[in-house]
Amino acid sequence: MSIIQEFREFAVKGNMIDLAVGVIIGGAFGKIVDSLVKDIIMPLITVITGGGVDFTQKFVVLGNNPDNLQSLDALQKAGVNVLTYGNFLTILINFIILAWVVFLMVKLINRMRRKQEEAPAAPAPTPEDIALLREIRDELKNRPQV
């Protein structure tokens, strides 16, 4: 078997295709969660915390600020060390939501698997030789003792 044939068999196996589909859907789902956090959750948190707070603009200057710059973009362009904790909080919330959804999906899949395992299998039909032996046994039991 040539290496090309081996690769073809490897690439078209069900698990590889399932993995590819999972990666594609995961990438799209990640964008949905990112939008949920950035466009819905963080603005709600901003309103709850008093309004006017944009977490992506929360930072601490770590060092000299020679021109007394105030915006994050200007500080980063000037090469000033900046600790952008607001961006980290946004990404952390994004991760927690994504991890929670994955946890719920795995839990649902495991529950469905358990239900399939718990379903009793239909008893296998008794083989003909065993049935015949049982008939003989029953006949011998019912036979009058001599």
From Swiss-Prot:
Membrane topology: Multi-pass membrane protein
Cited Pfam families: MscL
Keywords on record: Cell inner membrane, Cell membrane, Ion channel, Ion transport, Membrane, Transmembrane, Transmembrane helix, Transport
Compartment(s): Cell inner membrane
Transmembrane segments: 17-37, 40-60, 89-109
One GO MF term attached to the UniProt entry: mechanosensitive monoatomic ion channel activity
GO CC annotations, alphabetized: plasma membrane
InterPro entries (alphabetical): Mechanosensitive_channel_CS, MS_channel, MSC/AndL, MscL_channel
PROSITE patterns: MSCL (PS01327)
SUPFAM superfamilies associated with the record: Gated mechanosensitive channel
Domain of life according to the entry: Bacteria
Coiled-coil region list: none
Family the UniProt entry places it in: Belongs to the MscL family.
Biological role: Channel that opens in response to stretch forces in the membrane lipid bilayer. May participate in the regulation of osmotic pressure changes within the cell.
Complexes and interactors: Homopentamer.
Official protein name in the record: Large-conductance mechanosensitive channel
Gene name of the encoded protein: mscL
